[in-house]
Amino acid sequence: MTLSAWFVAFLLDHWLGDPPRWPHPVRWMGNLITLLQRAIRTLCHSEWALKWGGAVLWLLVVGITWLVSWGFLWLMTEINPWLGWLAQVWMIYTLLAGRCLSDAALAVFDALQHGTLAQSREKLSWIVGRDTSQLEKPQITRAVVETVAENSVDGVIAPLFFLMLGGAPLAMAYKAVNTLDSMVGYKTPKYRAIGYMSARMDDLANWLPARLSWVLLSAAAWLIQADYRQALRIGWRDRYQHSSPNCAWSEATVAGALGIRLGGPNDYCGERVEKPWIGDERREVALSDIPRSIHLMMMASLLALLLFALTHLLLVGI
């Protein structure tokens, strides 16, 4: 019954996405992080103390998330096995963000096609951290493709990977790791100390899924008749062209598959950040690259599901 829950949850994410009014564990994790962070900042004042406080924050959030997830699943299964199955489906469904990522990217795509530049910039600002106020259409398009490529790892591939390793509770714990990084894992003066542990552990958690994305996205490129040879070549060549040890793997692979260049300098919080270019500019970026990148992400997600399900079947059984 475990594998059937995986596939049903995957289909639910594909069909429904994340309706904004539905309860979602990530919001609960965010509330817990905010509460604990406030308490730690009250108790810890030096940079050294905040670093240790950040480690405690990470341990508490990840530990509580795993324990509550495991306890909830155990309780539902004890009441009735089918109730446990439904609980597992719901948990996995909330972990996957493929449809949500697709919808966010297509919202910018639609604004670029039918709306104004200001609308496109505003919708892009909802999904990226860079300053979007001065971006033109090619830069907006490039930013959307980068976001789809990067988030294909932590939005789908990595949750499925940890689902294979330790079931829904471990996958939920991974989501807590990812949420911690997105909330406190910054290098700004405010978060550098308290978010140090969260940032490092997120890098560690995504290390293998990011490298698997090179293979999965290249295979996806072959299936959708994109340039899989360049996906493999550029994905390997430019795998370290990023300050993160993980982000460039998926970005470079998508850049190679589409034949465009990603990365480059951007503005963050009023400061110019010089980033290396990723990929070869065999042509100018086009609006059609947004749906093509989504297609790549969706196909790679399906391949990840099949690969991890097959691995689980061979090692554990149904």
Curated annotation (Swiss-Prot):
The main location is: membrane
* Domain of life, per lineage: Bacteria
In the UniProt record, which is one GO cellular component term? plasma membrane
Q: Which UniProt keywords apply?
A: Cell membrane, Cobalamin biosynthesis, Membrane, Transmembrane, Transmembrane helix
Molecular function in Gene Ontology: ABC-type vitamin B12 transporter activity; threonine-phosphate decarboxylase activity
Q: What does this protein do?
A: Converts cobyric acid to cobinamide by the addition of aminopropanol on the F carboxylic group.
Instruction: Indicate what this protein is called per its UniProt record.
Output: Cobalamin biosynthesis protein CobD
- Please tell me the species this chain comes from: Yersinia enterocolitica serotype O:8 / biotype 1B (strain NCTC 13174 / 8081)
